From Swiss-Prot:
Function: Essential for recycling GMP and indirectly, cGMP.
Cellular component aspect of the GO annotation: cytosol
Gene for this chain: gmk
Positions bound to ATP: A14, P15, S16, G17, G18, G19, K20, T21
Keywords, ordered alphabetically: ATP-binding, Cytoplasm, Kinase, Nucleotide-binding, Transferase
Protein name (database record): Guanylate kinase
Length: 209
C-alpha cells in the first residue's frame, strides 16, 4: 500500500513498433520528478543501447534465478526473450515520492495492475497497420520473417486496448508526446494527491476565513 505522498506509477504499453519507448523518453525529458524503470532482459543489446540505461542485459540462467528469488513484480517471454520489472526499483522510487513509468507490453501491464491497482495505464496505437509495418522495417533490426511475426502479434495485442485507462494514437509524434505528458500532469493534480502536497497552503487559506 502506498500513501498519498508517494509517487505515481504509470504503465505505457504498445505493440512492437508503436513508438512507446520514444514517447517515454520524451516524457522523461519534458516532465520533472519522473523516472523510467529499467527492466531486465535476456535479449541481445541493440545498436545505441546502453547497459543500465535501456535495460539490464543478463543471460537466461541469471533471469530464471531472479524469478525464483521473487525479484520481479512482472515478467514475460516476448519473441523468445525474457523481460522482467524489478520490485525493488519501483518501490524505492515510489516511497521517495518519485513518479515511475514502466515501458512494458500488455502482459506485463496486466500483472502490474494486480499489484498496483492505482497505477495509471496508457496504451499507444499506430494510425494504421501499414504505418506500424513501415516503422518496424525502418528500424532495420529484424529480418522479414521476424517482422511478419511481430505484425501478427500486434493484431492480437491491439485487442487489449479496453484494459487500459487511456488510449493515444501515435500518428503525430509531438501531439502524442503532449497527450502523454498531459495524462501525467493531470494525474498529479488529483485531489487525493494535492490534499497532502498542499496541506499547509490549504490550512492557511481556510484558517484565514
Amino acid at each position: 500500500m502506498v500513501s498519498d505522498n508517494s509517487g505515481n506509477l504509470y504503465i505505457v504499453a504498445a505493440p512492437s513498433g508503436g513508438g512507446k519507448t520514444s514517447l517515454v523518453k520524451k516524457l522523461i525529458e519534458m516532465v520533472g520528478e519522473i523516472e523510467v524503470s529499467v527492466s531486465h532482459t535476456t535479449r541481445p543489446m541493440r545498436p545505441g543501447e546502453k547497459e543500465g540505461v535501456d535495460y539490464f542485459f543478463i543471460d537466461e540462467e541469471q533471469f530464471i534465478s531472479m524469478v525464483n528469488e521473487g525479484a520481479f513484480i512482472e515478467h514475460a517471454k516476448v519473441f523468445n526473450h525474457w523481460y522482467g520489472t524489478s520490485v525493488a526499483q519501483i518501490n524505492k522510487r515510489l516511497q521517495f515520492g518519485i513518479d515511475v513509468v514502466l515501458d512494458i507490453d500488455w502482459q506485463g501491464a496486466e500483472q502490474i495492475r494486480h499489484s498496483y491497482p492505482d497505477a495509471v495505464s496508457v496504451f499507444i496505437i499506430p494510425p494504421s497497420l501499414d504505418t506500424l509495418k513501415e516503422r518496424l522495417m525502418n528500424r532495420r533490426q529484424d529480418k522479414d520473417n521476424v517482422i511478419s511475426e511481430r505484425m501478427t502479434k500486434a493484431q492480437d495485442e491491439l485487442g487489449h486496448y479496453p484494459e487500459f485507462d487511456y488510449l493515444i494514437v501515435n500518428d503525430d509524434f509531438e501531439k502524442a508526446a503532449m497527450e502523454l505528458q498531459s495524462i501525467v500532469i493531470a494525474n498529479r493534480l488529483r485531489i487525493e494527491k494535492q490534499v497532502n502536497k498542499q496541506a499547509k497552503l490549504l490550512s492557511f487559506l481556510l484558517s484565514s476565513q
